[in-house]
Amino acid sequence: MALSVPPIAGAIIGYFTNDLAITMLFRPYKPIKIGQRTLPFTPGLIPANQERLARRISDAIMGSLLTPEELQKLTRRLLQTERVQAAIQWLLKMALDQVQSETEQKSAQVLAHILHDLLGSAIPRLIRVWARREDFLEAQLNQIFDQVLLELKLSEEQAGRIADWLLQVVLPPDRLRQTLIDFLTDRNIQVIDEDLREKTSGTYWVVANLFGVRNTLIRLRDFCIEEREACNVRLAELMDALGVRQRLIEGLQDLSLQNLPVATVRQLRKVFRQNVRIYIQSQGLELVKGLSDSLNWEHVSLSILNRLRSSTAVTASLEVVSQELALVLERYLERDLEIIVEKAIPILNLDEVIVERVKATTPQELEAAIQGIVKSELQAIVTLGGVLGLLIGIAQSVLLLVQGGL
C-alpha cells in the first residue's frame, strides 16, 4: 500500500500541475489587502503585469507576424483584381440604387445645379475662347452645310404653300395693279415708246412707228386706276391662265444649292462658317445663358435620372467600368504598394490597438482563453505531465523498496 502512494500522487500532481500553474498565474484577480498592506503575490502575476504583457504581445506580433512584408502580402491578397472589381461594382450599384431611391429629388436638385452652372457659366466662356480659332467647329459646320443645307430641297406640298403665300400675301392682284400704276409713269411710258421705235425692226418696227405703244400703255394705266375691281379680276384670271402658281412650285422645287457652281458653293460654305463663328463670338454667350436660364433644370435632371434608371446600357456598363477601375488600382498598387503600407502602418497604429485590446480583456477572460487552448490543443502536455508524475512516483517506490531491502 505504501509503495502505491508515490505513483498515484505523482500522476495526480503531474496531471493537474498545468491547470494549477495557470490558475496561480491569474489568481487572485484583484489585490488582497490587510489593513493598508497588500499581501504578496496579489493579484496574480498576469493581472499585476497586464499592461507590460500587452506591450510584449504587441511587440511579438508586430515583430514577427505583422511585419511590413506580411502586411504587403495581406494587402495583395485582399486587393486582388477580382475582389476589387466586385467591390467597385457593388459601390456603383449602391450609388445607382441611391439615385433611384427616395433621395431622387435631392439628387435631381444637385444635378440641376451642376448642369445650370455648366451650361450657364463654364461652357459659354469656353465657347467664347474656342470661337477665336479659325478652325472652330470647321468640320462640324462643313458637315451641316453639306448634309443639310446643300441637300435641302422643298417638297411639293412645301413649295405649294410658299407659292400660295407669295400669290396671296406678297403679290396679290391688287398689289400687282398698284405696281403697274407706279411703274407706268409718263416718263417710263415715253422711254418704252422711244426704245421700241428705235431698236425694233421688221414687223415690230412698223407697229411701233405707225401705232406706237404710248397710247396703249396710257390706256392700261387708266384702266388700272379707274377700274380697280375689274383690273384685279383680270390680273387674277391672267395669272391663273399663265399657270403662275404651278411655275412657282416648279421653280421652288428646283431651287437647290446643288445647282450652283462648285466655286460658289465653296464660297457659301466659307461664308456660312465665318458668320456662325462671328455670331458665336458676339452673341453666343448671351444665347447660351438665355437658353440656360429658360430651361427647367430640375425637370431636365429628373428626366436624366429616370432615363438612367431604365437604361440597360448603364447597368451593363457597370461591370466594364468596375473592371477598368480595378485594373487602374492594380497598376497603382504594383508601383506604390510598399510606400502605401509604410504610410498606413503608423496611421493604423496596430501595436497600440493590440495593447488596448489586451488591456481591455479581463483576467477572467484571459484565463478562460488559455484554459480553453490547453484543453483543446495542449491536452497531450497535460497527459504527459500525468505520465511523468506516474513514472517519477514509480521510481520513488522502487527506490523505497530497494532501501527497505537493504
UniProtKB/Swiss-Prot annotation:
Keywords: Cell inner membrane, Cell membrane, Membrane, Transmembrane, Transmembrane helix. InterPro entries: DUF445 (IPR007383), UCP032178 (IPR016991). It holds the Pfam family DUF445. It is a single-pass membrane protein. One of its GO terms (cellular component) is plasma membrane. The keyword Kinase does not apply. It is found in: Cell inner membrane. The chain crosses the membrane at residues 381-401. Its main location: membrane. Belongs to the UPF0754 family. PANTHER family: UPF0754 MEMBRANE PROTEIN YHEB (PTHR35791:SF1). This is UPF0754 membrane protein Cyan7425_4067. It comes from Cyanothece sp. (strain PCC 7425 / ATCC 29141).
